[in-house]
Amino acid sequence: VRAPKETSHIQASTLPMNSLTARLSLDLLGLNKDQVLAVTGGPGAYGGFVIQLAKADGLTVIADSNESDRDLLESLGVDIIIPRGEGFAERVREEFPNGVDGIADGALLNESAIEAVKDGGSFTSVRGFKGESQRDIDFTATWVTAYDCKKAILETLCQQAEEGVLTLRVADSVTMQNAAEAHTKLEAGGTRGRMVIEF
């Protein structure tokens, strides 16, 4: 698959893994236009793509955020922003008393986010759900390898990047000799976009 037009190699390298993971999450959730999706970890690379793809799919999106990330989430298209911190599920229920139709759990909140989902809703996590199944919620794990060799999906994502539906966010790039610096930054948390190692 060719890189999106008018992008650098560094920018283009941020597309495949996280956008495919985000697309898979939404496909696993199986939500329909006008349904409501909650996203945890929205400011991150995965969460940002989930938000933008969900909006392109016609979903209403609610996400939690620190005040410092509020402008970013607004630029990604989030409809409702709630404060990050304890009580995620309760804050979601304040906005949607019956619960949301699905959650893409990029921040790995696991059981602390379940109460935000309505009975019979959907929950997917990037590392697999840790907790007890309940209330007929459909729990899935988003493993990007499920979309290995799915050329048509990646081509669509490329086109969406070209059209501005998806934003290719580079947090920073480092040379191969400074790869440890990238790992140090990732371990510190708070990365917005992808760290890229240049070869």
Question: Predicted segments — roles?
Answer:
Residues V1-F199:
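Terminal helix/beta-alpha structural elements that buttress the NAD(P)+-binding lobe
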